[in-house]
Design a protein with these regions (language model features):
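Adenine nucleotide-associated cytosolic modules
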Residues: 1-153
Length: 153
């Protein structure tokens, strides 16, 4: 969903007062490093076919399906508890149904038991971002890039 939902509060770094608000807008207000944003709901492949690369950080199974079945280069970043991964358009298409499995396509960043404090917080979402940044750099430098990578911390 594009809106903060109650289920997001425990694992996507949102606060109770942000429940029901647009996720992109909340990110813009909360992070000084976000200089410009423009919510862009993706509903069809036609909307993204001109992009050089699509980076997916969605918790929406329909968006992932659209991307995985497209002919557009993409990178999907995921984090769940102490695990993180990236999956690229180069991954074996026969395995996409397995890669798309999960409850409503959601993959937690801090784990279901995260209470909002930083004590014992899992930082797998930061690891996923770092791995993704390296992959993107290599992709645009025309270096070899991996199909996927999974890390357990």
């Amino acid at each position: 969903s594009q809106l903060v939902e109650k289920k997001n509060l425990t694992y996507q770094n949102f606060k109770e007062k942000e429940n029901g608000m647009n996720k992109a807008s909340v990110m813009n207000w909360n992070y000084d490093s976000v200089k410009h944003f423009s919510p862009y709901p993706v509903l069809t492949e036609k909307q993204i076919k001109s992009f050089d690369l699509v980076i997916c950080c969605a918790d929406n199974l329909d968006v992932r399906r659209l991307l995985y079945r497209s002919n557009i280069p993409w990178l999907d970043l995921r984090a769940q508890g102490r695990n993180c991964a990236y999956i690229s358009y180069r991954a074996d298409r026969n395995k996409h149904d397995v890669l798309l499995a999960g409850p409503e396509g959601s993959f937690s960043c801090q784990g279901d038991s995260w209470d909002g404090s930083t004590e014992g917080q899992h930082f797998s979402h930061i690891i996923a971002a770092g791995m993704g940044a390296e992959w993107i750099h290599r992709y645009f430098a025309k270096d070899d890039v991996a199909d996927f990578k999974v890390v357990n911390v």
